[in-house]
Amino acid sequence: QRQMCIRDSRNMMKIVYNRFIPFGRFTALTVLVWLFVKEGVALTARLLNHEKIHMRQQLEIVAVCLLGTVAAHLLFGVSAWWMLAAVPAPLLIYGLSVAIEVLLPPYNRAYGNSCFETEAIYNQHDPLYTRRWWRHLFAWITYIPNRKYPYIPPEKRPPMMKN
């Protein structure tokens, strides 16, 4: 199991190469600031940018959950222990998004039709997308109506950006 850390002035992502996570047909999986990559998979600039978009989406959800629980604690006296729910919140919201897409046709593209994946697919070719975060804060919400942003099969996605 190899590990490396990518740092720039805007974000930090710990990359873990292993054979267990991600599972199935996926080549990479982002969980907050950890990027799990299958052994033997080349980490291209486009794939790294795609996963950085997912990292930003998840950190936005964590921030909102933390701010919401702090506000609820200060305003209504709700227990501060609810702040612990902010950590698994992105995974639960991702799962809910995919579950909603499973209920809507076409069923075979549920993950690709989720608003989170649609935002990442449409913007993975732009190396500056994650650096201009203030312009794209909660941009995944605009990708919820998937008729405006249809699913792009892998063979029709934009070519890889230059490294």
Regions found by a protein language model. Name each.
Residues 33, 54, 120:
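Divalent metal-coordination and catalytic microenvironments
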Residues 39, 56-57, 124:
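Activation segment
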Residues 46-58:
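Active-site recognition of the HExxH zinc-binding catalytic motif
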